Amino acid sequence: MLAARYLAGYPPELIAQAEQLRLDGRLADHLARRLPERHEVRSDSALFAYVQDLKTRHLRNAEPLNFVGYDAKLRVLQHALGTHTRRTQVQGAKLKMRREIRVATLFKEAPAALLRMIVVHELAHLRELEHNKPFYKLCQHMEPDYFQLEFDLRLYLMQQEELK
């Protein structure tokens, strides 16, 4: 049961509905109706500009980002769709903190709302490192439909795996 793997933790009725959509071949149509908008953020520089725009809109006082880009190896190696890293770099007698956000290349072709959701998730890690209540509250502040988009992302991943 593919839905159980991606939707673990959701109510059994919801898992059954998602699995039925998949088995009936209606999952792609359902997602196309829910998430019709596509995006043009295809390059690392466009992604950096997109992330910076969201960051200045919602997290003005957060530390600057040194790198934002797509990462082709991300999903395979770390079983993650996006990462945020903080690395300390020695420059002479000073320590400098580098902050990076990497997004799986899967999102180059994903609907715009799903890209926005993963970027919001990684930006929230600039303030809150752990996945706790303040973290999700911040995500919801930046993207009011965050929890619905997270569920839609899980459905999208199910559909993508089925296409392989």
Kindly give the residue locations of the regions a language model identified.
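Walker B beta-strand of ABC/ABC-like P-loop ATPase nucleotide-binding domains
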Residues: 119
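Walker B catalytic acidic pair
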Residues: 122
